[in-house]
Curated annotation (Swiss-Prot):
Gene that this sequence comes from: pyrC
Cofactor requirement: Zn(2+)
Keyword Zinc recorded: yes
Co-factor remark: Binds 2 Zn(2+) ions per subunit.
Coiled-coil parts of chain: none
Name this polypeptide is given: Dihydroorotase
């Protein structure tokens, strides 16, 4: 079966061009302005006039809660939410129960992801057994079982010796190591960033050095080992400065920023609405501005959502006791397009690189991130011209925990295609 996506503004090879895309048998057959030579009488047509046609977005940081907490999210609901947001490839973090920390457990997750996922789900292995021990996993074994990278996300690796051995092992087999950077000895019970706002609200604050101290340590270890070291959800200007310096000096480091750290600061916290509670916590306005600048200067390589659904019960508690995290898959592109591209802070081409091309290339997801003849037809179509209101009733995720509910944005997903199959389509009014 053939599908012709016609008259769209197509992002391809770094350029936005008015052209058509022909999909046949799950792959991209042709891209161009006149594709009639490829057509017969049996094809479907999608008129993408006034719409953006993009490579399917890539999010290397999601939490699908299955197995262990399926009341919060499942592979099916999480991947449906990803498709709703225009994502066709995601990276599933290993903070599930049981933790995928052996080749057998990783293989089980890979098979389950393939069975239940509406999008391509790349699976992380843990770095250490149970994500909290000092025993480094069998890196060669988990890679052979299908892990695309390793991470203990949700916890930082506390012992420098453990991290050094993990980096050596990951480097030996060519696995990226993605780090949740948090020195737990510096938390001091903080539930938000320490500063004027935490003192005003009377909430316990944790200093920003919680993050930057571990970034500094890990960059030294990454330089010593040569591993591909990836910093998850970077959030402070000091961390950015060190990452920028490390890149200039040959360290193989990449990093991601989240939409919420790019768009919100600790000034948004009122002490009651726990939708503003996440980890890393919202930072100072100077950090937020530094993150936005780092999107343009290349310090930040990609945007990842850290999609973290929770039940209303877990998020409805007192701010100090509520769970960390917000949902992100379904709103990320629209929020960033509205708040960064439409305001002139970021070019659309750069946003698409940050959300599709760059993460795919950094993590060697070779079939993702590009529209290319002969490659899988993983495609997202967005409406950049008509505003809509973010409404939790529209979410396909089980989690509705978002501080962005009620915001008017542009960039609604019209259609998402995975391997040539439509996995999400906007309902027309």
């Amino acid at each position: 079966m053939k599908t012709l996506i016609k008259n769209g503004t197509v992002y391809n090879d770094g350029r936005l061009v008015k052209e058509d895309v022909l999909v046949e048998d799950g792959i991209i057959r042709a891209i161009g302005k006149d594709l009639h030579e490829y057509l017969d009488d049996d094809y479907d047509e999608l008129d993408a006039g006034n719409l953006l046609v993009s490579p399917g977005l890539v999010d290397v940081h999601v939490h699908y809660r299955e197995p262990g907490q399926t009341e919060k999210e499942t592979i099916k609901t999480g991947s449906a939410a990803a498709a709703h947001g225009g994502f066709t490839t995601v990276g599933a973090m290993p903070n599930v129960d049981p933790v995928p920390d052996t080749p057998a457990k990783v293989a089980q997750m890979v098979a389950k992801n393939k069975q239940d996922g509406l999008v391509h789900i790349a699976q992380y292995s843990a770095i250490t057994t149970d994500r909290t021990s000092d025993e480094v996993v069998d890196m060669a074994g988990v890679k052979q079982a299908g892990a695309f990278a390793v991470s203990n996300d949700g916890n930082g690796v506390q012992a420098a010796g453990t991290m050094y051995r993990a980096m050596q092992a990951a480097k030996a087999v060519g696995l990226p190591l993605a780090a949740h950077v948090e020195d737990e000895s510096l938390l001091f019970g903080g539930v938000m960033t320490e500063g004027d706002r935490s003192r005003y609200l009377g909430l316990p604050g944790a200093p920003e050095v919680v993050e930057s101290a571990q970034v500094a340590r890990d960059l030294a270890l990454a330089k010593a080992t040569g591993v591909h070291y990836h910093v998850c959800h970077v959030s402070t200007k000091d961390s950015l400065a060190m990452i920028h310096f490390a890149k200039q000096n040959g360290v193989r480091v990449t990093c991601e920023a989240t939409p919420h750290h790019l768009l919100l600061s600790d000034q948004c916290i009122d002490g009651h609405d726990s939708n503003y509670k996440m980890n890393p916590p919202l930072r100072h306005e100077a950090d937020r501005r530094a993150l936005v600048a780092a999107l343009n200067d290349g310090t930040v390589d990609m945007i990842a959502t850290d999609h973290a659904p929770h039940t209303e019960e877990d998020k409805g508690r007192d701010f100090c006791c509520a769970a960390n995290g917000i949902t992100g898959s379904e709103t990320a592109f629209a929020l960033l397009y509205t708040k960064l591209v439409k305001t002139g802070l970021l070019k659309l081409e750069r946003l698409l690189d940050l959300m599709a091309t760059n993460p795919a290339e950094a993590f060697n997801l070779t079939e993702a991130g590009h529209l290319e003849v002969g490659k899988p037809a993983d495609i997202a179509v967005f409406d950049l011209n008509h505003p809509y209101v973010i409404d939790q009733r529209d979410y396909l995720s089980k989690g509705i925990n978002s501080p962005f509910t009620g915001m008017t944005v542009y960039g609604q997903t019209v259609m998402t295609m995975v391997d040539g199959q439509v996995v999400y389509q906007r309902k027309e009014n």
